Amino acid sequence: MLKSTMFKKSLVVAAFTLGSAIALPAAAQSSAPVVCPGYEKGTTNLVGERVGKKVQKAFEAYNEDLIDDAITILSEIEAKEDFDKAYVNRFLGNIMATKDGMGPKALELLVSSVETKVLNDLEHSQTLKLVADLSLQEKEYEQAVKYYQAYLDFTCKEDPEVYTRMANAFYELKQYDKLIDPANKAIALYEEPNKNPYVLKLSSYYERKMYKETVGVAEDIVNTFPEEGKWWVQLGQFYLMIEDYKKSLATLEIAYDQGFLEKPNLIKMLSQLYATNNMPYRSAKVLAENIANGKIEKTADNLASVANSYHQAMEYETAAQYYQQAAEMSSDPEFYRKQGVL
């Protein structure tokens, strides 16, 4: 909560200082808002004196946590110059964006501040991005895509976060094919691997029933984030979808050895895969171990499954013992018969 509050505060401070007579720190000045080839910085516009005084008063009210007062002061400003109008709308939109329930109005003001294209380049670029972020937050996904693209076109910056959020907007729009390109760009641009674009990409293929491609992305996730157990499990399940039982077994076996398989149904899946891959002894052993440690319920059916696998592995004495346990729990004559045969 504190981090969120500080971030929102910084938005308002930035909105006030940019375009006002207050100087920014050298570090902020040195960061070019636009990196397009041949870009030349234009003349810096400053808000007019009359409007500036009222904006200063609103900012002081905001700093004293008199948010509603700040909003009232800014709302009453009747700016005449295009830059002053855009500047006030931007500042007011930034403040409203920090208040719950005022997202739509904030968006309206922020959009109006960039549509005229009179803000200074840094203000314009930051506002394009803020409009996109707020649109995503307000579930205005088409508008989010529009303004993320506008930000990229205006700045020529390659921002992995922007590409990830754009991919997310495409996902929410169910335009699954369109999210692949921004997701790939995000993956390539992140200095430290970020799971989000991988997951969006995987979801895109999965939703379109492109299961081989889904497996490919899942393999990338496991290789990039090997410590996250759930992805090993999901990769094993995805292999089953393309009927690659050997890779499914190998993957789930690693997951089991690393302690990633905890749910009974997943342990049973591993046991069944051993059986499918002609490894009945391992099938029986993994099931028996987890019945013994309580992860799998001790029922007649589960005991019979252990017995069947030991039977197939020609471990007749052990199989007979498990058939006996199954028979005692269920009084099923079939289990007694199988025990007798052995």
Protein language model regions, located:
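Solenoidal tandem-repeat scaffolds enriched in leucines and small polar residues
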Residues: 153-258, 262
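N-terminal leader/linker segments that initiate helical-solenoid repeat arrays
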Residues: 2-126, 137, 146, 172
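Generic helix N-cap/helix-start motif at coil->alpha-helix transitions
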Residues: 46-55, 83-89, 120-129, 155-165, ...
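Structural motif corresponding to the intra-repeat A-B loop/turn of tetratricopeptide repeats
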Residues: 64, 99-100, 138, 173, ...
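TPR-repeat structural position
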Residues: 67, 102-103, 141, 176, ...
